Amino acid sequence: MIDIKLLEQLCLCNGISGDEGNVRNLIINEIKDCADDIKTDNLGNLIVFKKGKKSAKSKLMVSAHMDEVGLMVTDITSDGYLKFDEVGGIDRRVLPGKRVCVGRNGLNGVIGVKPIHLTNGDEKTAVPKMNDMYIDIGAESREDALKYVNYGDGINFEGDFKINGKTFVTKALDDRFGCYVLINLIKSEPEYDMYFTFVVQEEVGLRGARPAAFTVNPDFALVIESTTAADVAEVDASHQVCNLSKGATVTVMDRATVYDKEMISAAFELAEKNNIAVQYKRAVAGGNDSGAIHQSRGGVRTLAVSLPSRYIHAPSTAANLDDCESVLKLVKVLSDYIAGGNLAKGKTV
């Protein structure tokens, strides 16, 4: 069973790229009594060692990123409105009218844009540019705003966690669900010794994963992610990357990584053997920390296992609880299989 309370805590914890401290502290608090070693590196990555029942025959690193997409204050107008830019890739179409939390104190604000009745021609239907939007915090002047916020302050989307049957909607599922999976594995009794990395700044260029992988120096890596589903209205089946309620998603190739073929085969064989729902990601698109990890040192054999998610990189993301279970079960059996030495070290295919 998925621990809904913990997953909700992780998703609603604010932590855009470069400001992951609250998320890291939450994770440490969850694992401090069951992890054998916990270190935080200079960039903010959390590197955890968990002793298993047996010594590992292959060194495995299981990884997820702590950061979420968001915004950052870049300027403050003379009349107290905040100008901003994106932190990570965000669909601008969904921003106007969204409620946000500004700075570490979580000051409430709302994203505004020129009122529709004052627009003309193509302006009425055009997607607003970042420069044309602002955040209203109720300040009356720049001086007034500076009492509460400063240049460079992070801006998080205000979120909640709602469940409707097997479907749930929340913010920051990318990649707090991955963090949830790692926490679950650390709390369990793995068959073999394993390393776990909760990394920073994935959304702005895979920046934390490289030093984390360099430090651990694994033979194999599993990256736990969320990936776009696109199984929505008006999208032809041939363009649906993966589907909700169809299980864990395994990627063959994306814009940053060509994944290890033996690891892919092992994932599907173990899924069939253990009656775990699994599907292929049916598009070459996007990327994740695998892109940095697999190039570390002399190379790391890597696979990404993802949760199908609708409306990813937006203030609200939808996913399926059965898929969550499938990802968790697959990662558990696959991690024990790899750490147990069932795949030869080095490239064999």
What are these regions (language model features)?
Residues 1-349:
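N-terminal hydrophobic/helix-forming segments and targeting peptides
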